[in-house]
Amino acid sequence: MDILISKDRAIAPPSAIRFTECRLPGCYLLEFPSYRDYRGRFVKSFQRSAFEQRGLECDFKETFYTESAENVLRGMHFQVPPADHAKLAYCISGGICDMALDLRVGSPTYGEHESYELSAEYNNAVYLPRGLAHGFLVRSAPSVVVYQVTSEHSPAHDTGIRWNSFGATWQLSAPVVSVRDEVLIPFEQFESPFRFDPELVSKPMPAKEPAR
């Protein structure tokens, strides 16, 4: 939700990003602080200290974005170890139905999926830990989705799960899907290399020693 600022009032410093735990362990829905005035809008989309306080991996190595037309479906993508990564995804234009699939053997939600409505209007994002497949369906276009990931792209480790093989309800019978995504392996045939570690989900990061 935007905070409206009048012409005669200076913009206040951004407040903290709000984190809400999702059903899949280690996943969070984020709400960015946003301010709007007669010039436009100001949004804070990352705050390292807020991630570190929750023990969330946030040493992002790459940032990229996709621009997609309406009814385009991308997914379900991930990289296998040792090039796996955590991911932060959000819209700066349009809106999407974002989808995550838990591939971590031993997780209480292994094989289950969860969807999130993300949009530039909502100023929200989703954080996904390692071991989850990710994809989305465009609801309103043009949709520009930004990704920040904790490992660089590695073609040898880049793969995915077929979008219609794990029981998700996309509410669209014939989305626009790439040839690559149509031939990804179905979930029931995927032998997961990911293992669930509850310590990595809930353990806060140690406090940094002050600089001398």
Tell what function each PLM region has.
Residues E121-N123, R130-V149:
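Ligand-binding loop in jelly-roll beta-barrel domains
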Residues D2-E121, S140-P142, E152-R212:
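Non-catalytic, conserved peripheral segments adjacent to functional cores
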